[in-house]
A protein has these predicted regions:
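Extracytoplasmic/lumenal domain signature
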Residues: 1-26, 31-184
Length: 184
């Protein structure tokens, strides 16, 4: 199959304009939600909290995307919404979308976000991490984990958000999709 590029948006530049400052992390992941908003996360592997890196989560409103696809001029400054994470926090993997919103796993928390003329944090659930792992002679496991945090993208069911933490030993966590409460 052949693909045709139909949309070209500099998401990082649009997010920097919305924030009013330069981003120190790259665009890491994007996903469309059920309403057609394009969610994004900045980050990278091994975002060490003590290094004070700062990621952002956000979206481009579906109305702007539709306008651009229809060949219309669009003011992205009114259509890009961002949520600046605390210093030391950023995404390290993919993101997912459900009817309830966008689910984004950072190196410290799992978020459910909704697009409501801005980024609405529905819930934020912290999880355990032992940080970056390094293997030594005689270790039974390798330290080859790519991420400081969970190291996976969230998996969604109609009622649950599933992901692994970065504890020792690693655990599979199940969160209630509506509340963010750890249920298993």
């Amino acid at each position: 199959p052949e693909f045709e590029k139909v949309l070209d948006i500099d998401i990082k530049a649009a997010a920097e304009t919305a924030l009013g400052k330069e981003l120190t992390q790259n665009l890491l992941s994007v996903v469309f939600d059920y309403d057609g908003n394009l969610w994004f996360a900045t980050g990278g592997f091994r975002i060490y909290p003590e290094r004070q890196q700062q990621g952002v989560l956000g979206y481009i409103a579906h109305t702007a995307i539709e306008s651009i696809l229809n060949g219309e001029q669009t003011d992205l400054s009114k259509a890009v919404f961002v949520y600046g994470l605390p210093l030391g926090e950023g995404a390290e993997n993919g993101i997912a979308a459900s009817k309830d919103g966008a689910v984004i796993l950072t190196n410290q928390n799992c978020y459910l976000l909704r697009a409501e003329e801005g980024v609405n944090v529905v819930w934020c659930t912290p999880y355990e991490s032992v940080g970056a792992k390094v293997s030594h002679d005689g270790d039974k496991t390798t330290g080859g984990g790519l991420a400081w945090g969970g190291g996976c993208s969230p998996t969604l069911t109609p009622n649950l958000v599933l992901f692994t933490d970065n504890a020792d030993p690693v655990k599979l966590l199940a969160l209630d999709m509506k509340t963010g409460e750890v249920v298993a």
